[in-house]
């Protein structure tokens, strides 16, 4: 009798644990999908801002403590310093972005995003150089980007660290 009682409640306990584990896994998958979707939306609006030379829209994609680490240029810290960097960038050229796949890894309130993107630059008004050190200078540039994103208090994502490595032309 005790054996039957013990077996019955042990099986019930294991069933409850298993159900709870499945529930947590489903919740985790849902959260992962929601984060991925939000992050991809961030890049969509960020790229629209670049392609329309919208500095405010661009800055809206960045955490206030953004760090830009451009290859061949100085490290830029803070959204207002980044805004100053963008002035000559958008005054001198227009841009079109062809983005590749995003490799997104979310770790709590931080996300690491890797992607390969090609940027098409068209100089304006006889310009032939962007005056901001570290800005892209070639008409076509393919780069491997590495961004660190931070979840904001409202649950949205913004870029905390932005850097890239140029992909050599073969």
Regions found by a protein language model. Give the residues of each.
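Bacterial N-terminal signal peptides that target proteins for export
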Residues: 2-11
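Bacterial N-terminal signal peptides
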Residues: 10-21
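A beta-strand edge to alpha-helix "cap/lid" segment located at domain peripheries
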Residues: 26-60, 67-170
């Amino acid at each position: 009798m005790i054996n039957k009682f013990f077996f019955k409640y042990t099986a019930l306990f294991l069933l409850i644990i298993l159900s709870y584990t499945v529930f947590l896994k489903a919740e985790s998958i849902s959260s992962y999908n929601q984060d991925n979707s939000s992050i991809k939306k961030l890049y969509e609006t960020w790229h629209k801002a670049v392609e329309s030379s919208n500095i405010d829209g661009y800055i809206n994609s960045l955490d206030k403590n953004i760090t830009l680490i451009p290859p061949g240029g100085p490290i830029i810290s803070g959204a207002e310093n980044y805004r100053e960097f963008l002035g000559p960038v958008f005054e001198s050229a227009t841009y079109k972005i062809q983005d590749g796949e995003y490799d997104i890894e979310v770790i709590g309130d931080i996300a690491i995003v890797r992607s390969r993107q090609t940027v098409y630059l068209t100089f304006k008004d006889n310009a032939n150089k962007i005056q901001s050190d570290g800005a892209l200078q070639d008409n076509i540039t393919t780069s491997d980007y590495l961004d660190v994103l931070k979840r904001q208090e409202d649950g949205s994502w913004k870029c905390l660290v932005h850097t890239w490595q140029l992909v050599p032309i073969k």
